Amino acid sequence: DIYSAFASTVYERPINKNDDPVERFVGKTAILGLGYGMGAQKFKDTLAAGAMGPPVHFTLSQAQNVVNTYRSTYRGIPNLWRKLEDLLKQTLHKDNYGNVYGPLTVAANRLCLPNGMALNYHNLRYSSAGLVYDSRNKTEYTYGGRITENVIQALARIIITDSMLRLDKEHDVALTVHDEIIITSTNINPNATMDKIITDMCIPPSWASDIPLDAEGGYAREYSK
């Protein structure tokens, strides 16, 4: 449980889901939010809002301590923010077109994905605020954490879509909900069917053959959480 593990680091004592729901919620909010550059004030406000759990009230100093702990515990994540921001800046200069970083390829104002699609930043340019681009009828500001969120969501979507295509060969894929795939099946052996589905969902893509994938599931006559 990564939420409890990080909460244990923050509170300097063992935290578990059953006995420490408030502390674990702090860990969950940190893991889900701080990975994309959320700062102390936004973290404090998110905890107080209690949208995903019980409202928790931190001082700004306490919130900053959690942010600092996250960034020092997972040093590779801030490094990724900087790397992806630099990669997006490369899209502004044609001498960089074709540069590759992992599954991403640099092109004009966009980062090309391994499935042939791309993250487009129309009219990307520098401003006094930093990197900005045109989005519909407004100008959007972007930075390392937000670019990282764009990339992670896009790559994750490719992975789950690949799983859907594999599963659709044997079953009827009805819909998806976030990272869930819901299928209908007439197979009379639901346990074996579920085992096969989980196996198919854990097949890594060729462009990230060492990515650690895992899945779990269940079955019923109707969809429920």
What is the predicted role of each segment?
Residues 1-225:
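Conserved catalytic core of nucleotide polymerization and phosphodiester-bond processing enzymes
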